[in-house]
Amino acid sequence: IILVTGPTGSGKTTTLYSSLLRINSPDTKIITTEDPVEYQLDGINQIQVHPKIGLTFAQSLRSILRHDPDVVLVGEIRDHETAENAIQASLTGHLVFSTLHTNDASGAFSRMIDMGVEPFLVASTVEAVMAQRLLRRLCPHCKEAYTPNPDDLPRDFPWESFSEGKLYRPTGCRECRGVGYSGRMGVYELLITTDEIRELAHERRSSWEVKQAALKSGMRTLRDDAWVKAMRGETSAEEVLRITKSDRAIETEASNA
């Protein structure tokens, strides 16, 4: 199972569709179940769920598996039944893509366990989790370089990588209609499930412990990826702080959940 996490409007569907198009071929049978079907994809069978007539994610997934697909996309794992069916699909040799609503990538394991899925099943089937957000992109015509005051930046700012010494901020012009931003871009946090992470998930350890293990194996957080883009001049520090959360804030939310 490969999961994409993030709030509504964070680009999860676009990421999943891009992934399917990348692996699509005449020899690969791909079937999706979605709510709604947002784009028509050539060469891919897409099913629109309709709960009023009993066609839920779980029911449609059971039907899909009778057609012996190679790849299955489940629009969202919302409940225990859908989670169980997705797990069973992956255990029988199918590549499964789906989405969850969590604050970060490491929270996906505890989220599925909270739905009632056995920890050993989650640990053995989830291969990767990608969290994502969308940041506004600075207008290239009017963005302004400046030297930031260290007191204005949070403690997690990566000063050790800040060789240019400049960040950029919006000013507004005709091209961007005075907004200072033009378009959006993604920031990503990709967690690859290592043996250590599988063991932590199996033992029902906290999302914070899973995250520390992922960081040790080289994962870049959403905040870190956003800072990289800010240092490149693609977005502003204000936008980074508006959209992403510090590790401390995420840890506090996890402990209160």
Regions from the language model: what does each represent?
Residues 1-257:
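Short, flexible helix-loop junctions that flank or precede catalytic/ligand sites
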